[in-house]
């Protein structure tokens, strides 16, 4: 895991690092949901459409088109990362400390901090605003990311607070954490949504930075636990958007037994601006989602190989 220290259980006023709390989500589990996005990830998928969630540290995101050149950020920056030269605003990320002072003084949206330290109480105060919607729609709260398992102690405490309020819970995870982490989460989770991104182990390591052995082992444990679960695969052009790869994953998922359904998630190009804002390389710049006919073909393969209901999103 890259970045700041993860809060430990028992420390005074435990805090987690959260990138966003999205209300009225319809895609992160059943019913109307609030999705809490944890910052930090233990994988490095080259196609990630949320690159701001990879590091657990709060980070500055820069959107030059929103800048009006007022200079307020220059005055606020103590590191000298922001200067005005020949009437033009310049930013040197190499000396930036991501303290957030410039963003606090920017009112145009040119400078935005991604990631905020929050207590369980602070997160719950936002969640509880919509508890009536959860109850009436069969919804609840989903912990996502980044990767929820990179802040396990905070996740457990938040899940406990949710269950104390009789709110349905779900997690979205890559399943790459040690099984002991999931054992600590499972008593407070009603639904597990996990990814199997690539079936071939060497290809998985090439594209995500890690082997998939632990992921497949954890998937079997989730299935054997009896906990409700579903499986997703992001369909990435040039990586796994072919019948062989999707077929292999689907066959494995079907063999686990008990999955509610299998979902193919088409590549999302909307993260390109985030790479620019972070000033980091985007290996999938210009990539577009699999075309409709290709997606339909993969859907049929997934249905045939898994024996499960298949959704495409």
Go through each PLM region and give its residues.
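Residue-level detector of anion-binding/catalytic polar loops
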Residues: 73, 168, 228, 308-309
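Conserved AdoMet/S-adenosylmethionine-binding subsite of the radical SAM
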Residues: 121-277
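N-terminal pre-triad scaffold of radical SAM enzymes
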Residues: 19-72, 89-98
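Auxiliary Fe-S-binding modules of radical SAM enzymes
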Residues: 7-30, 235-313
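N-terminal-biased segments
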Residues: 29-30, 37, 50, 54-55, ...
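Iron-sulfur cluster-binding cysteine motifs and their immediate structural context
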Residues: 46-53, 72-91, 101-117
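Anion (oxyanion) recognition and catalysis
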Residues: 98, 163, 223, 303-304
């Amino acid at each position: 895991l890259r970045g700041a220290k993860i809060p430990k259980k028992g420390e005074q006023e435990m805090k987690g690092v959260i990138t966003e709390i999205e209300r009225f989500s319809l895609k992160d589990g059943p019913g109307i949901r609030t999705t809490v996005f944890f910052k930090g990830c233990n994988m490095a998928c080259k196609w990630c459409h949320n690159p701001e969630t990879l590091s657990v540290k709060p980070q500055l995101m820069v959107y030059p088109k929103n800048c009006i050149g007022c200079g307020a950020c220059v005055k606020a920056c103590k590191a000298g990362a922001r200067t005005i030269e020949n009437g033009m605003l310049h930013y040197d990320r190499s000396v930036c400390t991501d303290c957030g002072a410039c963003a606090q003084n920017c009112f145009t949206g040119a400078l935005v901090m991604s990631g905020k330290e929050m207590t369980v109480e602070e997160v719950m105060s936002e969640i509880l605003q919509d508890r009536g919607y959860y109850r009436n729609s069969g919804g609840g709260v989903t912990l996502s990311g980044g990767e929820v398992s990179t802040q396990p102690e905070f996740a457990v405490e938040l899940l406990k607070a949710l269950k104390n309020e009789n709110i349905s819970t779900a997690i979205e995870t890559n399943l790459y954490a040690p099984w002991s982490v999931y054992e600590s989460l499972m008593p407070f989770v009603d639904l597990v949504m996990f990814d199997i991104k690539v079936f071939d182990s060497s290809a998985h390591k090439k594209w995500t930075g890690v082997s998939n052995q632990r992921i497949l082992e954890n998937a079997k444990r989730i299935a054997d636990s009896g906990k409700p679960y579903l499986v997703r695969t992001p369909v990435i052009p040039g990586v796994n958007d072919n019948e062989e790869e999707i077929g292999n994953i689907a066959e494995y998922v079907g063999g686990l037994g008990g999955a509610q359904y299998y979902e193919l998630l088409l590549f999302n190009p909307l993260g390109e601006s985030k790479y620019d804002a972070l000033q980091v390389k985007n290996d999938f710049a210009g990539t577009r989602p699999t075309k409709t006919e290709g997606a339909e073909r993969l859907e049929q393969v997934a249905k045939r190989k898994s024996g499960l209901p298949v959704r495409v999103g």
